[in-house]
Amino acid sequence: MATKKQSAKKSAQTKPRPAAGKQSEPAVKVALLGFGTVGSSVATVLAGSKFPGIQLTHIFNRNVARKVSSPVAKSVPASAVWTDDINVILNSDVDIVIELMGGLNPVEGWLRKAIVSGKSVVTANKQLIAYRGAGLAKLAAQHNVHLFHGAAVAGGVPVIPGMLQGLCGDQVTRLSGIVNGTCNYILSRMETGANYATVLADAQQLGYAEADPSADVDGYDARAKLCILSRIALHAELDPDAVSTQTISTVEAIDFSYAKELNCTIRQISRAQVNGGLVHARVGPMLVPLASPIAWSHGTQNMVVVSGRFGGDVVFSGHGAGGAPTAVAVVSDLLAVAQGCKSVQLPVRKRKVTGEFLAPHYLRFVVDDKPGIVSAIAGALAKVGANIDSILQRPGYPKHRLPFVVTTEPCLTSTIEQALASLAKMDCMLERPLCLQMLQIEDKPDEA
């Protein structure tokens, strides 16, 4: 009996389903794994919209009693089965599993079992897709089911489906932008003069930042998303752990003042570009020219600029954080699977990664002012082949703790780091110098 049911289900999945409004067709049965902010928002979207061909039949949550009695559970159909036993769902006749729990284990194992049993998967799990996406996609293709992950990057911004469907005819050469709403909220608030600690506390209170914010502020969240986008846009399989990251926590309010003098602001930028067999990839705070659209992305807004060889730049922008925007992306993927859309399998090659970009650099020093300091800095930079472009010093600071900024002409970060290593030994240096790359509108990291 089980074999017959499973065979019938697999047959149905290989054919496009009629439009959701045709009641004569059996409903597509859906299970939710996780009922947190995004999971409950997905249930609300399904309940508040007319999707008669979609039936939410199962919900997995580790604390069923608490969730069932919560106000957000009112959007769940009374007939839905709540369970804390994953096998109830894996052994059911569910057609599509929506995974919203996050992390690698035990989720990867559960989804592999779901795929093998003939269930399609929709997920917003960026870590899973960044680290295990290629293997899961291959497994899904082998079992004639689908794996959709449009909500894994930029929440409600359709950057993944946009690249898969709208840009697949172009040859994408570069992508850059903002894919972490938490960091964008923090940095755009600091732009108005607020300090990092205060804004971080506000972000945590608003639910934008976790109690441990390191995944966001140190760039790990954005790194996973950059790897996903690189696989789709650049056809490059990257090891996330090999992608260079830099924290935003060392950026201070004064840096925004200096950035303004340079007609720039500061944002956490994720960027990647193919150069032969290499991919230049990096996540970190950068000075962004005010002439770039990325500079005008505020709050939790995400923005990704995709540069194509033939079509030029395409900008994707919208709210990336929050339950509702992400839920919209999840439900869009769900409907695509239910309507028989195929998940696109693009040719992907494993690529070596370098964090090197040829770019101008912003260097902020804090010193006990003494004669010869600027000369020493210029000498250290000249020794490694880096040329100074400008020197900025704001009035009103005491000489015993004097901040000032040096910007360089385009050079490699590794070159700058050599100079900073020697300068750090000087007694007059009161802090480790802050080094930020400066984004150029016509940036050409392929020359690195």
Indicate where each model-derived feature is located.
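NAD(P)-binding Rossmann-fold cofactor-contacting core
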Residues: 49-72
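Rossmann-fold NAD(P) dinucleotide-binding segment
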Residues: 86-124
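Substrate-binding/catalytic subdomain of NAD(P)-dependent oxidoreductase enzymes
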Residues: 189-190, 198-296, 301-303
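Polybasic, lysine-enriched low-complexity intrinsically disordered terminal tails
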Residues: 1-23
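Rossmann-fold NAD(P)-binding glycine/threonine-rich loop
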Residues: 108-113, 117, 126-164
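N-terminal Rossmann-fold NAD(P) dinucleotide-binding loop
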Residues: 39-40
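Rossmann-like NAD(P)H-binding beta-loop-alpha module
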Residues: 141-144, 148-221, 228
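A conserved regulatory-domain signal marking ACT and ACT-like small-molecule sensing domains
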Residues: 33, 329-448
